[in-house]
Regions:
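C-terminal membrane-solvent junction of multi-pass transporters and transport-like membrane proteins
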Residues: 84-87, 99, 107, 113-116, ...
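Helix-loop-helix junctions that connect adjacent transmembrane segments
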Residues: 68-86, 116-214, 218-282, 288
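Membrane-helix boundary/coupling elements in multi-pass transport proteins
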Residues: 35-53, 195, 200-205, 281-324, ...
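Terminal cytosolic tails of multi-pass membrane transporters
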Residues: 142-161, 175, 391-417, 435-493
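Hydrophobic transmembrane alpha-helices that form the core helical bundles
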Residues: 1-92, 96, 299-309
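Juxtamembrane helix-boundary/capping and inter-helix hinge elements in multi-pass membrane proteins
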Residues: 9-14, 22-28, 206-216, 315-324, ...
Length: 493
């Protein structure tokens, strides 16, 4: 509601950067968008290995159903069995080059390709939900699983979750869970990580034609609806279908939370199509096709992120937040080519540090490099302004910039909508981010905690963003740019 309302009166590419820089302050708008760019590039670096992992899983599904592909678990891996080192880096760069091919398509072609791939991915998601529940049974899954795990049973996997403290042995009331200051905010922070990017349509609003408010609102609500169904309803339903405690323990082992299950069952995370082929191998072609949707979705997210990042960078260049050449629009692409290339290069750098142990200890999340869990947490910390400033914009816009929202939809309700929204990110960041940091600083492992969770890395990028802002403001002032006028007006269409 906030994005669709503000986009209606400020229909420009750049999204919340444009809103925050005009409503709050140019510095806050810059820092919010700078940290969102870093968070989004981290997400791209997070998604690329997942594309490779899902290729492995797809091959394993064929192997379980029809035979062969016994070595799929070692594809793209080094001696440790993880997608890292030189094999992982080379494979990741190949995926990044394919992402670049899509990201560098002319705008109309880009959106046609993205729409087609998204349609395929959503169809696979629906197919897994419907056919997975109809054509598989928990009893078959439990009976067949030991054949593919070297004798490890579903019950044993579930028990390891209890031993590691991942599975609760006592239950609390609904409201005590909702207002928990421990696990619930942590899980919500992970969920916010999944949802970064839903605001894509608001960030390309300068390219939306027709009824901007309606188009952006439908696109945003549609993205959120799919996100809720995919991350909550779908996952919970399928997990409960195959045994909830087993799935939580299995997934916890993949992400490093279940220390009692060191060997990953089947050598893979508990992908839904993989669970389905264990339960009913006769339908392996169906599960394989659905698994390809799992390859497409993380791949698809990457060029979409690059596209909306480039539109933010275009808005930066128009506001002299970065050199003007950064936002030069290519006639062929109808988009800022230099910004897209810069984003791809930065992603490649992060992929390098995910693959090789070349980071100083204080910057590494584990073993002198970034790991996937550390990358995710790093991104969550970087996104704090992205999740909070829209609420402050909604609360303050009628007082700070009444000229901009005189005719805005939901204008009178915006302060209340913003206040209601702020409850969620503030609750999450206070108890899932700030509280653990404070506790770590009080304890004896403060430096280790700050290193392994990417907090130090995030602090460095915040500092880099601040330095860039003041350097560019100095350059703009020296060039005689009227900054007050610049940030009073919205960027040109």
């Amino acid at each position: 509601l906030i994005f669709s309302s503000l986009t209606s009166v400020m229909p420009r590419s750049g999204g919340d950067y444009v809103f925050s820089s005009r409503i709050l302050h140019p510095f806050l708008g810059w820092l919010e968008s700078w940290t969102l760019v870093i968070a989004s590039v981290l997400i791209i670096a997070f998604e690329v290995p997942l594309v490779l992992r899902n290729l492995q899983i797809s091959a394993r599904i064929i192997g379980i159903g029809a035979g062969g592909f016994h070595g799929a678990n070692t594809w793209f891996t080094d001696a440790t069995g993880t997608i890292t080192g030189t094999p992982g880096f080379i494979a990741s760069i190949i995926v990044l080059l394919l992402i670049a091919v899509v990201a560098l398509l002319p705008t109309r072609t880009f959106h046609r390709v993205v729409t087609t791939l998204a349609g395929f991915g959503v169809a696979c998601f629906i197919g897994m939900f419907v056919f997975g529940l109809l054509f598989t049974h928990r009893g078959s899954f439990i009976a067949n699983l030991p054949r593919y795990t070297g004798g490890v049973t579903s019950a044993h996997i579930a028990q390891t979750g209890v031993k590691s403290g991942l599975i609760a042995t006592s239950s609390s009331g609904f409201f005590s869970n909702i207002f928990s200051t421990t696990v619930f905010p942590l899980m919500l922070s992970v969920l916010l990580f999944q949802f970064i990017g839903f605001q894509y349509s608001a960030y390309i609003a300068g390219e939306v034609r027709g009824n901007v408010r309606r188009g952006v609102l439908i696109a945003l609500c549609g993205a959120l609806l799919i996100g809720v169904l995919a991350n909550s309803v779908y996952v919970d339903a399928i997990s409960s279908h195959f045994g909830f405690n087993t799935q939580v323990s299995w997934g916890g082992s993949y992400w490093g939370f279940n220390t009692s299950l060191t060997a990953l069952p089947i050598g893979q995370p508990n992908s839904m199509p993989l669970l389905a082929v264990v339960a009913n191998s006769s339908l392996w072609p169906l599960w394989f096709l659905i698994s390809l949707g799992g390859v497409v979705f993380p791949f698809l997210l990457c060029p979409v992120y690059i596209n909306f990042i480039s539109r933010m960078q275009l808005a930066w260049s128009l506001d002299r937040q970065v050199p003007e050449w950064f936002g030069n629009v290519s006639e062929r692409l109808r988009g800022p080519l230099n910004a897209i290339v810069a984003t791809l290069v930065l992603t490649g750098i992060f992929l390098f540090f995910q693959s090789y142990k070349d980071l100083p200890t204080f910057l590494a999340t584990t073993g002198h490099k970034l790991n996937l869990a550390g990358t995710a947490w790093f991104s969550i910390v970087m996104a704090i302004l992205t999740w909070t400033l829209p609420g402050f914009n909604a609360i303050l816009v009628r007082w700070r910039r009444p000229d901009l929202v005189r005719n805005a939809p939901f204008g009178k309700a915006l302060p209340w909508i913003g206040l209601a929204w702020l409850v969620f990110p503030l609750w999450i960041y206070i108890f899932a981010v700030i509280k653990p940091i404070v506790n770590a600083l009080k304890g004896g492992s403060a430096l280790t905690y700050l290193e392994t969770n990417g907090i130090i890395d995030a602090g460095i990028f915040y500092l880099i963003g601040i330095v860039i802002y003041f350097v560019m403001r100095y350059r703009a002032a020296k060039a005689g740019v009227d900054e007050k006028m610049l940030f009073t007006e919205i960027p040109p269409d």
